[in-house]
């Protein structure tokens, strides 16, 4: 760990204390995990504390950990992951908060802390079904009106549930249940012995 990261780690531990569930360093960046109950207050502290001053939210995304690693994940399924930047101190931190309920994943919105979180949270809601409590306009942002489900969840079928096609009789685009025929996605290619001048 570099001196700069050690200084940041010390400042985080001092400012946040027992709100830190875990703090790890990997690939030159610190990842902080906090409980959902402490999330909003932690984010305010990260922005307002003079020793930290994370003025900018760079990114916020959802993650579905149900098939993480070797598929034997045993923790909460959904998390919101934020990347913060301190322009003043020139350092970054990643903050992860797990939603306590897998069936209805809810975490606090940080739109009141960084207004840049608005569309990021809408995207995580749309694609993962993460509900951000206190968000001023939590509605879908990428999928179509009436879309059913959340397409980035690991249990969402790759083909989806409905498909869209043009109906020449009705002269408009219609939705219908997905009709998929079993097919080989990667064709088996058998090359001749002397293919490309190579000898086997």
From Swiss-Prot:
It is an enzyme of class 7 (translocase). It catalyses: a quinone + NADH + 5 H(+)(in) = a quinol + NAD(+) + 4 H(+)(out). One of its GO terms (cellular component) is plasma membrane. SUPFAM superfamilies: Nqo5-like (SSF143243). PROSITE patterns: COMPLEX1_30K (PS00542). Gene3D superfamilies: NADH:ubiquinone oxidoreductase, 30kDa subunit. InterPro entries: NADH_DH_suC, NADH_quin_OxRdtase_su_C/D-like, NADH_UbQ_OxRdtase_30kDa_su, NADH_UbQ_OxRdtase_CS. It is a peripheral membrane protein. It comes from the Bacteria. Pfam families: Complex1_30kDa. Its EC number is 7.1.1.-. Keywords: Cell inner membrane, Cell membrane, Membrane, NAD, Quinone, Translocase, Transport, Ubiquinone. One of its GO terms (molecular function) is NADH:ubiquinone reductase (non-electrogenic) activity. Belongs to the complex I 30 kDa subunit family. NDH-1 shuttles electrons from NADH, via FMN and iron-sulfur (Fe-S) centers, to quinones in the respiratory chain. The immediate electron acceptor for the enzyme in this species is believed to be ubiquinone. Couples the redox reaction to proton translocation (for every two electrons transferred, four hydrogen ions are translocated across the cytoplasmic membrane), and thus conserves the redox energy in a proton gradient. NDH-1 is composed of 14 different subunits. Subunits NuoB, C, D, E, F, and G constitute the peripheral sector of the complex. NCBIfam families: NuoC_fam, PRK06074.1-1. This is NADH-quinone oxidoreductase subunit C. It comes from Ralstonia nicotianae (strain ATCC BAA-1114 / GMI1000) (Ralstonia solanacearum).
């Amino acid at each position: 760990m570099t001196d700069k990261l050690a200084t940041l780690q010390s400042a985080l531990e001092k400012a946040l204390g027992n709100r830190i569930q875990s703090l790890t360093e990997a690939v030159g960046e610190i990842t902080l995990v906090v409980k959902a109950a402490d999330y909003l207050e932690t984010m305010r502290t990260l922005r307002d504390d003079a020793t930290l001053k994370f003025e900018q939210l760079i990114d916020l995304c959802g993650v579905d950990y149900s098939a993480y690693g070797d598929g034997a994940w045993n923790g909460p399924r959904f998390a919101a992951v934020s990347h913060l930047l301190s322009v003043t101190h020139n350092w970054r931190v990643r903050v992860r908060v797990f939603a306590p309920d897998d069936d209805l994943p809810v975490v606090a919105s940080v739109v009141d802390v960084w207004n840049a979180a608005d569309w990021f949270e809408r995207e995580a809601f749309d694609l993962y079904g993460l509900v951000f409590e206190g968000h001023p306009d939590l509605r879908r942002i990428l999928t179509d009106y009436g879309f059913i489900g959340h397409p980035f969840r690991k249990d969402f079928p790759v083909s989806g549930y409905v498909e869209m096609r043009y109906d020449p009789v009705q002269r408009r685009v219609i939705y219908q249940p997905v009709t998929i025929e079993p097919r080989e996605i990667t064709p088996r290619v058998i090359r001749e012995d002397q293919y490309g001048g190579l000898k086997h």
